[in-house]
Amino acid sequence: MNREELNLQFEKIYSRLNPEQKTAVDTIYGPVLVIAGPGTGKTQILSARIGKILLETDYMPDNILCLTYTDAGRVAMRKRLQEMIGADAYRVNIHTFHSFCNQVIQENISYFEKNSLDPVSDLERIDFIKQIIDHFKKDNPLKRYRGDVYYEVGRLTSLFSSMKKEGWTSTYIKDKVEEYCNDLPNREEYIAKRKTTTKGITFQKGDLRTDKINEEIKKISILNYAADAFDEYQTIMHKHNRYDFDDMINWVIQVFENNEPLLQDYQEKYQFLLVDEFQDTSGTQNMLVNLLCKEIDSPNVFVVGDDDQSIYRFQGANVENIEAYKNKYENQLVDVVLKSNYRSTQKILDLSRSIIENNTERLSAKYPDIKKELIASHDIRLSSVASPELHIYENTFQELVGVTNQIETLLQKGITPEKIAVIYKENKWGDELIKFFKEKQIPFYSKRKENLFHIPLSKKMITILRYIAAEHSISYSADDLLFEILHFDIYKIPSFEIAKASVAVNDAKYEKKTSLRTYFQEWIHTA
């Protein structure tokens, strides 16, 4: 696409922007913070800004680096940019943080000396953590001797990932645990509200509930044992020449910090930095952004985020990044708040604002200049007179039935299925709803494919495998799983017989090797 064609395409898109969006696009130089609420067209301004840079400066597409949080965001931005600037969209560097770090590593193998490493598989990661659990001392609270002895694999995996994403060390976590424990006596929930006697100890109203504090300290202190295992995990990974995606960001940060010329090469190459979904960046991702702007008086860094939409906090994301960015460039920063919403009706926006305003950690509560009152701006949405309704159910089952019945009623009124949408917080609720829809023969489409491991037969197979693994580790240790397995319809064992077996085992007071397994072995041989 030549410059004239680019200009025509850009003007076509630019003419549709509202004043706030135009301000964000027009501010090419210096640090910019765009607070983009839901449905305010942030992807459009990111692509329009890139078009503006290419039109009004002498820089090339490969002088622009755009970092997104997810692959979906990267694909959406590339597609929107291609519509505007054509084939040059593929010359603009649009990366997730991980793909950018991988590119840096591949371009500078000699700095990293990681050419002999391979990415760790999920199975390998689980095996490494099992090795760590096997090496735990007997008094380690994370070590189990009955049931699923590797129960903590999932939680340790999550912790180690968070430590890498945030750049935390085991010492840092221990310090935070100590800080948390020391603060417990200052918390209102540990002050007795009335006279209480528990375990022979009487607490008067206003007394410090030392029993609850000790219980909380005992629970949180387990984190110290888990953090201690992190270094061993890293040692095992190195021993087996393995790495994971979180390692890549830390490697690049370390090399940039220790090799100023290399960092400066990338700073020179990328004259414009754009960061999408900034509220969801982790500690290490934010460190990477700061390094790319290091010692530049007024960096051309453009970040888009919304403190009300931080959805990846459990993955290490930290909404405080927006606040830190605002404070860092306070005297140079251009703030832009997108207020025009093109997705929802005003009544929905007003309801959501009345809820989110209770959050005292919002930017608008800390910075009076940031006003986040979204205004419905789509022509179709402006004509809507429907009001949100709140339905309260006693339990989850009743809620699922209620939603299904409402949809069935709408279909009976002639509303077509494609005009009905269900939004849920967690995927598991979608799985449950699908069961009800199938029962009522309600046609549906889900973007989320059915998980093989959630199919009833798969669940049964997994339970059987868990039982075998537990028995292989410690014999006669998984009667609870066996009790569940015996009820599977594939075995056609009468429930009465299973109950008799449980009673017989209980009457035997669990003498040596007396278990459901032993009982049924004898029952089968004598039947």
What residue ranges belong to the model's regions?
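Short, intrinsically disordered, charge-balanced linker/junction segments flanking boundaries
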Residues: 523-527
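Conserved P-loop NTPase-based nucleic-acid remodeling module centered on helicase motor cores
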Residues: 63-175, 320-323
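Surface-exposed helix-capping loop/turn segments at secondary-structure junctions
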Residues: 134-146, 238-242, 261, 362-365, ...
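Conserved motor-region signature of P-loop NTPase helicases/translocases
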Residues: 1-79, 91, 219, 268, ...
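A general alpha-helix detector
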Residues: 128, 132, 159, 229-233, ...
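Amphipathic, charged-and-aliphatic alpha-helical interface segments
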Residues: 251, 256, 501-509
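Accessory N-terminal region flanking or inserted into the helicase ATPase core
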Residues: 1-35, 40, 44-47, 63-65, ...
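Short coil/turn segments at secondary-structure boundaries
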Residues: 143-147, 170-178, 239-250, 265-267, ...
